[in-house]
């Protein structure tokens, strides 16, 4: 573990019995108490996550808006000041360089929150595509910590620590310079769990203090510290993609089922031509949800079969703590992708029956 990157909270994990794993070169807790109990805490009360491994990149300057509008698939002209949106950066073949959140301060100032495994790649991609745009791009990931409080009790818990009325921060909006437990933070009503909640950004030196304050106040509400395991089962149930599983340089947003975040009518952007061609010609493969009929837990990489041939592979699979079923997502040949179709998942060399169902396994409980 010595050669892995660590967040400012690393020494605190031991106190909470964190089980540490290597995640994209970071030493991070996969669980504290247990994945299931942490998952259920977020669905029913609240969970506190250390997500300081995520990357933060600022884009500032006279042409920040035009630069980003060309770089991402979503339409920046629809984003208001103090609003956040989800988008993709694509390569010229339409594959996904990364999926990210864009925070807009103004047309000349944006904050991008990117996946930990892609920080250096994204930063290089942005600089390589800067061209003649008058912008300043800074990777500030090493200076910033991020905590996520997620679950139906998230607002109630955080409200105990601030005079700012958190109910005024609407879904996918943010407010800067919010004092939480006396610490100035950027707070957004965003998350990766399918529940209401907040993501809180602050300088590294305050991360431990804020974590402890939130744990202290949250106890009576049933808040638990939560690790990467629950973060993954929660996002998966809510139908949210994980880069490297449902998205990659080889998997386009259209194949992943996220055309909503690709705005073909906004003018030119990197990857547009390839994506438009794919849309017009029809998708050869797509990501589907499935539920196991036979007993077995599907896992990432398992083969999917139909008509005695391989038709794709599982991108994510779990026993769902909320639905109490074995379910998964798979990238398969489009001609087999209809709802209600029966497919086979090869588990321990044995083809087991599964049924294609909607990818939205769990109804999201966002406060809008």
UniProtKB/Swiss-Prot annotation:
Major enzyme class: transferase
Catalytic activity, reaction form: N(6)-[(R)-S(8)-aminomethyldihydrolipoyl]-L-lysyl-[protein] + (6S)-5,6,7,8-tetrahydrofolate = N(6)-[(R)-dihydrolipoyl]-L-lysyl-[protein] + (6R)-5,10-methylene-5,6,7,8-tetrahydrofolate + NH4(+)
GO-annotated biological processes: glycine decarboxylation via glycine cleavage system
Example GO molecular function: aminomethyltransferase activity
Keywords for this protein: Aminotransferase, Transferase
This protein's GO CC annotations: cytosol; glycine cleavage complex
One Pfam family of this chain: GCV_T_C
EC number, UniProt record: 2.1.2.10
Signal sequence annotation: none
Record bears the keyword Endoplasmic reticulum: no
UniProt keyword annotation of Transferase present: yes
Quaternary data: The glycine cleavage system is composed of four proteins: P, T, L and H.
Function: The glycine cleavage system catalyzes the degradation of glycine.
Protein family: Belongs to the GcvT family.
PANTHER family named in the record: AMINOMETHYLTRANSFERASE (PTHR43757), AMINOMETHYLTRANSFERASE, MITOCHONDRIAL (PTHR43757:SF2)
Name of the protein in question: Aminomethyltransferase
Organism: Thermoanaerobacter pseudethanolicus (strain ATCC 33223 / 39E) (Clostridium thermohydrosulfuricum)
Gene: gcvT
């Amino acid at each position: 573990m010595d050669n892995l990157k660590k967040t400012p909270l690393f020494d605190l994990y031991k106190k909470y019995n964190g089980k540490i794993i290597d995640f994209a070169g970071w030493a991070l807790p996969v669980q504290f108490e247990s994945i299931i109990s942490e998952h259920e805490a977020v669905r029913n009360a609240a969970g506190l996550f250390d997500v300081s491994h995520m990357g933060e990149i600022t884009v500032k300057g006279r042409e920040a808006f035009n630069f980003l509008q060309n770089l991402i698939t979503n339409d920046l002209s629809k984003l208001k000041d103090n609003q956040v949106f989800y988008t993709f950066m694509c390569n010229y073949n339409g594959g996904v360089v990364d999926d990210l959140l864009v925070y807009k301060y103004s047309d000349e100032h944006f904050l991008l929150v990117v996946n930990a495994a892609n920080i250096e790649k994204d930063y290089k991609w942005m600089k390589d595509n800067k061209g003649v745009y008058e912008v300043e791009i800074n990777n500030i990931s090493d200076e910033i910590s991020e905590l996520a409080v997620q679950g139906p009790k998230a607002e109630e818990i955080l409200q105990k620590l601030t005079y700012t009325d958190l109910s005024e921060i609407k879904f996918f909006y943010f407010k800067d310079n919010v004092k939480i437990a006396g610490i100035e933070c950027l707070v957004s009503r965003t998350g990766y769990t399918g529940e209401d909640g907040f993501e809180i950004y602050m300088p590294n030196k305050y991360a431990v203090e804020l974590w402890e304050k939130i744990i202290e106040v949250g106890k009576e509400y049933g808040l638990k510290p939560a690790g990467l395991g629950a973060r993954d089962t929660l996002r998966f149930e809510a139908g949210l993609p994980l880069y490297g599983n449902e998205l990659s340089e080889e998997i386009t947003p259209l194949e992943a089922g996220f055309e909503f975040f690709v705005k073909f009518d906004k003018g030119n952007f990197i990857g547009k031509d390839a994506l438009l061609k794919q849309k017009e010609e029809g998708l050869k493969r797509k990501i589907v949800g499935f539920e196991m009929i036979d007993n077995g837990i599907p896992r990432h990489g398992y083969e999917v079969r139909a008509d005695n041939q391989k038709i794709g592979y599982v991108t994510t699979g779990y026993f769902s703590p909320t639905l109490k079923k074995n379910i998964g997502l798979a990238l398969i040949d489009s001609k087999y992708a209809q709802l209600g179709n029966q497919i086979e998942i090869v588990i321990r060399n044995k083809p087991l029956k599964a049924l294609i169902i909607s990818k939205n396994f769990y109804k999201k409980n966002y406060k809008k």
